Amino acid sequence: LNSKISDYMKQNKSKEEASILARQGFVSAVGRALEKIIELLLKDFCIKNNVKMTNDKILRAKRINGELDKVKRALLVHFGEYSVLPDIILYQTNKDNVKILAILSVKNSFRERFTETPYWKLKLLQSPITSHIKVFMITPDNDDEISFKNKPKKALSWSMN
């Protein structure tokens, strides 16, 4: 982080602004790494079940094929001048049709972005075309924001469906 802060300060950023920018870059890199880990863990499942997987970074590319364009159009949410896509998308294809099965919202820090996942489900419920899509939030809960009085004996899976 210190070298990034120095780089930003060389660009005439204040120390405070440079620190914020460096931290944001670090947090973004950690988040993307977590998404990649989830994708690797799901790869075999997808192959065995004839499920395809993509992510927001791929869908934001300038040139995507027709299949990915259909996935993108099915999920793109607009906020004024901004457009938002979910982190990871699981889908199947059948001839010219694309069926979105699930979106995975991957959050390294539960605290800062926990409202995004339920928001996705609410948006998807507004249309009969997307209301079937499952929505899952995946987090390592590094900040221990999701806690239990007695630790559960089995791993938990939360679904917003």
Q: Where are these predicted regions, by residue range?
A:
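Phosphate/oxyanion-binding active-site loops and adjacent basic polyanion-contact surfaces
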Residues: 30-35, 81, 110-113
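Hydrophobic beta-strand segments of well-ordered beta-sheets in folded domains
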Residues: 102-103, 131-139, 161
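Interdomain/boundary linker segments immediately adjacent to catalytic/signaling cores
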Residues: 1-54
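Conserved catalytic cores of phosphodiester-cleaving nucleases, focusing on short active-site segments
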Residues: 88-90, 101-108, 117
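Active-site metal-binding core of divalent-cation-utilizing nuclease and nuclease-like domains
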Residues: 56-94
